Amino acid sequence: MRVFVLGVGATGSLLVQLLTRQGHRVSCGDRDPERARRFLGATSTIPVHEVNARNIRSIVKAACGAQLLINACPAILNKIVLRAALRLRAHYLDMAAHLTESPFRAEQLRFETGFQDLRRTAVITAGVAPGLTNLLIAASADLLDTVETVYVRLYEATESDSPVSQWSAEVAFDEAVSRPRLYRH
């Protein structure tokens, strides 16, 4: 499958490496190609395009011919990248929802009809759990001869002597300033 990964940070670069190992034809785009290449590693030959993820034309031009568009950018860019996927007639996968407009309904659901009309699949909010968790398991399993069973227990705590962020700076800021979700009664 021809796959284009938009956003080549920690999660995006791991996806690129795993998909390449599985035999997919992968290219990627990022606003900072040099940083993306550092995430991919010095020996990587995977093409990295400079892409403005706030511009549909920039995404479509870089991802032309992709059958799957993976959005590993901050969730605030979801709507733009979803429109690009529809224009490309590509399947779509993203990591998170940007819940500021409606904290109980992912904004990606507004695009459901467009994907159905094109007979394309959109998988939304596949980020940390199970997304990144499964990617880390797959990367670890590749280092072993055999794996019989994997059990996952998700525990939302991070402990370290130095500061650790599970999100990019943009996502952490977005989470901090988003309206809270209130449950009553």
Residue spans for each PLM region:
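Helix N-cap at the beta1-alpha1 junction of Rossmann-like dinucleotide-binding domains, i.e.
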Residues: 32-35
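N-terminal Rossmann-like NAD(P) cofactor-binding module of classical short-chain dehydrogenase/reductase
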Residues: 63, 67-72, 92-93
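Aromatic pocket-lining residues of Rossmann-like dinucleotide-binding sites
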Residues: 19
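Hydrophobic/small residue at the entry helix of a nucleotide-binding pocket
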Residues: 11
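Active-site-lining helix/loop region of Rossmann-like oxidoreductase modules
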Residues: 6, 142-185
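Rossmann-fold NAD(P)-binding glycine/threonine-rich loop
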Residues: 96-121
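Beta-loop-alpha module in the N-terminal Rossmann-like domain of NAD(P)-dependent dehydrogenases
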Residues: 58, 71-84
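Conserved Rossmann-fold cofactor-binding substructure of NAD(P)-dependent oxidoreductases
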Residues: 51-65, 77
